[in-house]
């Protein structure tokens, strides 16, 4: 029996995980003690990107080709079906934002209507701290804040960051929410594919949004994924 290759090690871990895993999980689970490289995380990244036995579900989320049908069915993900693609993508990035927030020791919130949406294979309600916002302001503003995709709160239950995931929906709607919430000492973030950045800038740079223009940050999907993958390296401000 020949020596087990690095690729075979990664594939075996994927099998043990049910056929799929995040790159962050692979970095933690693959036994690299016998690897001679000084950058095993980079090696694992190259393996999943280049192996014909592995395919990308979403940035940072990989699966075995032999498990393709099983994995896509498990995630209720039908390639080419806009509704299922939107649902999975939205839940995936909400979940990443929740996980990043929790790693930073923030309290995390997602709207109650999203509690059954999946983050990979778990309902968002299982990973977030709450689906109910604390009463940090009057009801009119709370009602607006409750619709934000992800909210980070500090230890005093005050908002630190408002995140809106914009896969296909109108970015202006999220900017309007942020405008209404501008009096809080919190960050405002639009999370979307990099292809929507110009649209974001065009809609932000109008007179109505001048009060928040310098406070709203565009986070592309890859930046969120890379932050999640490198959480062990995070120290202080992450964006």
Positions of PLM-derived features:
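Positively charged, polyanion-binding regions of nucleic-acid-associated proteins
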Residues: 1-24
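Charged low-complexity interaction tracts in eukaryotic proteins
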Residues: 2-7, 33-79
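Charged, structured surface patches that assemble and position nucleic-acid processing machinery
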Residues: 208-239
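Catalytic cores of nucleic-acid endonucleases
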Residues: 128, 134-148, 154-220
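Active-site metal-binding core of divalent-cation-utilizing nuclease and nuclease-like domains
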Residues: 80-86, 102, 109-157, 229-239
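Nuclease catalytic cores
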Residues: 44, 73-112
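A short acidic, leucine-rich amphipathic alpha-helix
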Residues: 25-30
């Amino acid at each position: 029996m020949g020596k087990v290759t690095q690729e075979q090690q990664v594939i075996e871990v994927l099998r043990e995980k049910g056929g799929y895993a995040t790159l962050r999980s692979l970095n933690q689970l693959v036994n690299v003690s016998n690897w001679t490289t000084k950058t095993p995380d980079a090696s694992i990244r190259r393996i999943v990107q280049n192996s014909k036995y592995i395919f990308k579900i979403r940035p940072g989320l990989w699966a075995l080709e032999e498990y393709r049908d099983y994995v896509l069915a498990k995630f209720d993900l039908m390639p080419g079906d806009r509704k299922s693609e939107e649902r999975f993508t939205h839940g995936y990035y909400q979940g990443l934002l929740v996980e990043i927030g929790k790693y930073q020791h923030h309290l995390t919130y997602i709207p109650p209507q999203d509690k059954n949406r999946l983050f990979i294979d778990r309902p968002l309600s299982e990973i977030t701290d709450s689906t109910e916002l604390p009463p940090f302001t009057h009801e009119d503003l709370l009602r607006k804040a409750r619709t934000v995709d992800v909210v980070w709160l500090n230890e005093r239950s005050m908002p630190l960051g408002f995140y809106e995931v914009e896969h296909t929906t109108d970015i202006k709607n999220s900017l309007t929410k942020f405008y209404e919430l501008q009096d809080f000492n919190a960050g405002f973030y639009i999370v979307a594919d990099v292809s929507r950045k110009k649209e974001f800038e065009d809609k932000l740079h109008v007179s109505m949004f001048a009060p928040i223009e310098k406070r709203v940050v565009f986070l592309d999907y890859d930046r969120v994924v890379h932050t999640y993958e490198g959480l062990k390296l995070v120290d202080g401000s992450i964006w």
